[in-house]
């Protein structure tokens, strides 16, 4: 039972509509890999995966074997790619649960092959090309050839794809992205023609059609937060709501919260909400962020506490005890987007969506699929 109103509300219909919009812009020949790592960017991995499937996604991307296993155990049968580097201990699960594994070293192929022999099954892999991100992947044609050589010696391990990741597709200068694209294309030429090639993250999906290849990998865009300007009708899929638990008046000269960083210059009405950095509401929002009350923006006063935050409701008569407060999302004609909340907090929309802690339960709208 929840004894205070403080929850995230995920609109699964928004997820479906966003996936349809992305899929529709790509055309029938380009698949959509729904990136659902990190609990679907804080939206709930399994429910989002089901909604994405309903809307036309055909593949899933996760970061770890544990995430892939969770999808399998909840009945997701579509291909799942693990983006992270394979460790020897992860080979058993990759084969057992039929998870496609990213590879970039010959020893990874050998680990999977050993598990194929033990389990009497095949393993599937995608080759990662480090074209400029600087994380994992082969960097040269020679390194890619070493992977192909290892695959020839391990017939149970099947190469089904190759991919790269752009470091700055949302940046103003396109030269580096195009350089990465050329590196990927050069290495791809020695790979079998039948495999899936994919490179486009959300930004590249929206800005660089030449990067679409056989499949695109929308992550943040699927959740309604496009990282670049677009005419595509993408809408945020999550709201974070709470309520006012106390209202008081303060006089000129009164201070608010720890460190007394806010001092009133006049008579004010101040509301307290039961949310703080212990819930994942960024402390950097202190004296900077705003919430929505009665459809209007109410500035945060003083420091965000661990469990409570105070806001200025002087000019908002609807601000009474029990009134809804929106930390993220729309209320009336106004909206606080993940990008806006991130800007106030000095961070990015991704972190905003992932920030809420276990004290902030999640509920869902439009779970029923309405075609």
Task: Describe each model-derived feature in a short phrase.
Residues 1-16, 67, 86, 93, ...:
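Active-site anion/phosphate-binding pocket segments in diverse small-molecule metabolic enzymes
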Residues 2-17, 27-199, 212:
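Active-site-proximal beta-alpha core segment in soluble small-molecule metabolic enzymes
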């Amino acid at each position: 039972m929840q004894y205070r109103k403080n929850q995230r509300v995920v609109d699964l219909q928004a997820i479906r509509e966003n996936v349809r919009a992305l899929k529709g812009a790509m055309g029938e020949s380009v698949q959509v890999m729904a990136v659902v790592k990190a609990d679907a960017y804080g939206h709930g991995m399994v429910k989002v995966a089901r909604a994405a499937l309903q809307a036309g996604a055909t593949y899933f991307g996760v970061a770890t074997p544990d995430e892939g296993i969770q999808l399998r155990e909840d009945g997701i049968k579509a291909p799942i790619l693990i983006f992270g580097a394979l460790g020897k201990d992860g080979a058993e699960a990759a084969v057992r649960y039929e998870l496609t594994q990213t590879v970039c070293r010959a020893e990874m192929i050998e680990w999977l092959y050993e598990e194929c022999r033990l389990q009497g099954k095949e393993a599937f892999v995608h080759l990662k090309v480090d074209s400029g991100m600087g994380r994992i992947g082969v960097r040269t044609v020679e390194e890619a050839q070493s992977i192909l050589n290892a695959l020839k010696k391990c017939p149970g391990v099947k190469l089904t794809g190759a991919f790269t990741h752009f470091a700055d597709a949302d940046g103003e200068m396109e030269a580096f992205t195009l350089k990465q694209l050329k590196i990927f294309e050069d290495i791809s030429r020695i790979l079998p023609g039948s495999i899936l090639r994919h490179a486009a993250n959300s930004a590249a999906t929206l800005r660089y059609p030449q990067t679409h290849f056989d499949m695109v990998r929308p992550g943040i865009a699927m959740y309604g937060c496009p990282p670049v300007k677009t005419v595509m009708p993408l809408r945020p899929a999550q709201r974070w709501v709470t309520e006012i638990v106390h209202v008081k008046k303060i006089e000129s000269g009164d201070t608010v919260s720890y460190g007394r960083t806010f001092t009133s210059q006049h008579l004010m009405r101040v509301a307290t909400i039961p949310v703080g950095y212990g819930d994942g509401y960024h402390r950097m929002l202190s004296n900077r962020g705003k919430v929505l009350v009665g459809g209007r923006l109410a500035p945060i006063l003083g420091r965000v506490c661990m469990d409570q935050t105070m806001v200025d409701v002087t000019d908002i008569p609807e601000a009474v005890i029990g009134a809804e407060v929106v930390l993220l999302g729309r209320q009336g004609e106004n909206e606080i987007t993940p990008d806006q909340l991130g800007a106030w907090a000095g961070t990015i929309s991704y972190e905003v969506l992932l920030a809420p802690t276990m004290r902030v339960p999640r509920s869902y709208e439009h779970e029923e699929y309405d075609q």
